[in-house]
Amino acid sequence: MHKVVLLRHGESLWNMENRFTGWTDVDLSPKGIEEARESGKTLKAEGYTFDCAFTSVLKRAIRTLWIVLDELDRMWIPVYKSWRLNERHYGALQGLNKAETAKKYGEEQVKIWRRSADVRPPALEKDDPRYPGFDPRYADLSEEEIPLTENLIDTINRVIPYWESTIAPTIKSGKKVLIVAHGNSLRGLVKYLDNLSKQEIMELNIPTGIPLVYELDDDLKPIRHYYLADEEKVKEKKELVENQGKIQGNS
């Protein structure tokens, strides 16, 4: 049996302001730093240790990982960063307040943009300053790989090849792996692992800063999964995520 731990980064400054973030490189809020620290302490108390870690190229995930590894006294382990673990690209919605967007377009439309598997938000133009092609961290990507907007399926289509080519073989080799990423890149991975339907994934929220453990068989098929937190805390944090797209959302 193998175990892999998935962790959504702690609350970011734009999570705090209830804004669509996507590929915007926003740092952790003070609360997010504390969430990351608590995650590290929880993993340490539960006896978890890691041989290597995977994360995105966005600082809110990277910093969460740093803090967790610091708590575990494992800052020396190899860390692999890939744009394929980035948050879903929210197109022209990036930077907009979710509650104000719900007021303008309706809560149902915002829920569809945020949660559906196959609907893309309005796209960026290539001359928009927010276009990732202007960012040096994506200099090695082809124009086709750089998104103007993404739905969840698009996100899955970049996450899963990285899982299959790089992360899965690492787990199969016997290494203990930690993945620190984002709400939608992790939702995509969970959809793949648990073979969830489009409707099931639309209702799935992953809370910030709570380790999610997957126990996998030798073929990396899930045996079971669980959060390292009590049910009430998980429920409360999931509701915070869900309420972000509502007119009164203020998470």
UniProtKB/Swiss-Prot annotation:
The record marks 182 as: Transition state stabilizer. Keywords: Gluconeogenesis, Glycolysis, Isomerase. Pfam families: His_Phos_1 (PF00300). It catalyses: (2R)-2-phosphoglycerate = (2R)-3-phosphoglycerate. One of its GO terms (biological process) is glycolytic process. Its EC number is 5.4.2.11. It is an enzyme of class 5 (isomerase). GO terms for molecular function: phosphoglycerate mutase activity. PROSITE patterns: PG_MUTASE (PS00175). The active site is at 9 (tele-phosphohistidine intermediate), 87 (proton donor/acceptor). Signal peptide: none annotated. Pathway: Carbohydrate degradation; glycolysis; pyruvate from D-glyceraldehyde 3-phosphate: step 3/5. Substrate binds at residues 8-15, 21-22, 60, 87-90, 98, 114-115, 183-184. It comes from the Bacteria. InterPro entries: His_Pase_superF_clade-1, His_PPase_superfam, PG/BPGM_mutase_AS, Phosphogly_mut1. Belongs to the phosphoglycerate mutase family. BPG-dependent PGAM subfamily. Catalyzes the interconversion of 2-phosphoglycerate and 3-phosphoglycerate. HAMAP family: PGAM_GpmA. This is 2,3-bisphosphoglycerate-dependent phosphoglycerate mutase. It comes from Thermoanaerobacter sp. (strain X514).
